[in-house]
Amino acid sequence: MKLGVVGLPNVGKSTLFNAITKAGAQAANYPFCTIEPNEGVVAVADHRLDVLNEMYHPKSLVPAVIKFVDIAGLVRGAYKGEGLGNKFLAHIREVDAIVHVVRCFEDMNIVHVDGSVDPVRDMDTINLELIYADLEAIDRRIDKAKKNSKSGEKKYLAEIDFLERIKAHLDDMKPVRSMDMTDDEKKAAEELFLLTTKPVIYVANISEDEIGSEPEAVKKLYEQAAKEGAEAMTVCAKVEEELSELSDEEKAAFIEELGIGESGLDKLVRASYSLLGLISFLTAGTDEVRAWTITKGTKAPGAAGKIHTDFERGFIRAEVVPYETLVREGSLNACKDKGLVRSEGKDYVVQDGDIIVFRFNV
């Protein structure tokens, strides 16, 4: 699973990416300083691992991770291939969700491509490019379905009807993700690989002076996100980049001084994890304490397969204890003695925070 970090040139996108990954993606006051997407893997902050680390003192501690991709800045006409449009759209097709960084700060030293700060206009600029690209794709699919429908098969007529509904929604300049669809239709829409089916988090990038306040530009961004049914959050990318260079102790002191309670990046990573419908199950022992990423609704054999394909192929059962129960009782053996470890079969749906030992035979 990976998220694409997008935004118009000079909105602070690469600065934010630097902070989340500490990968040093070039951040300069120049459009298209990011030409090839930079990728970074980020740990998902999880206090449960810290507690289990103190309990087990394992040889290794492995957090869940999420991948971010810094995608080159976009300009109007991208869907027609202008600027780096073709590359931009190709890279967006490869990600599972979008982190859309929107400039909400004023800075005379950093030129805005449109000459002024207007978050709603900037949101629309990128969204319209994605909608136009989807319209072209849908038109091609409709033409193909109409040719196939000449065979008289009813499935093609149903497909045309569905595609026409999507086209009408896009013609209204609305993303496909905001359509009312049944679960089956949502699945069918995902199989079309349209750009506007991808979930979005809008990130309002503010200046350090605006931390703790609610600038008018941010209010407008939140209002627009609410209309789209999208998530939104506020960060100061420059401060987050500074925080990423500090030790844990220095970071905690700086966060306290800023009065923000928690870094914006921790919030972003957690929100991204949630947006993708991801949860973590845990394995714990003296060799390793680890968080494993799965999608909500994954059954026990599928979760076992995340560890090794043999675990899934030869799955017998899962021995499960909730994290809170293990911590309360102090050890897995204590949980077993009290009959608190459940034996679950192949139909068990794994829950966030389950601590699991898989039994298998191949």
Residue ranges and their predicted role:
Residues 1-111, 139, 145:
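Conserved G1/Walker A P-loop phosphate-binding module
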Residues 2-6, 11, 17, 144-349, ...:
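C-terminal-of-GTPase-core extension/linker across diverse P-loop GTPases
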Residues 6, 32, 37-40, 47, ...:
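Short capping/connector residues at structural and topological boundaries
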Residues 14, 31, 67, 71, ...:
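Generic signal for short, ordered secondary-structure residues
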Residues 23-31, 38-40, 48-51, 80, ...:
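Glycine-rich, flexible loop/turn motifs
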Residues 32, 46-49, 62-68, 82-96, ...:
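Amphipathic alpha-helical transducer elements in NTP-driven molecular machines
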Residues 40-45, 72-82, 93-156, 169-182, ...:
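Conserved Switch II/interswitch segment of TRAFAC-class P-loop GTPases
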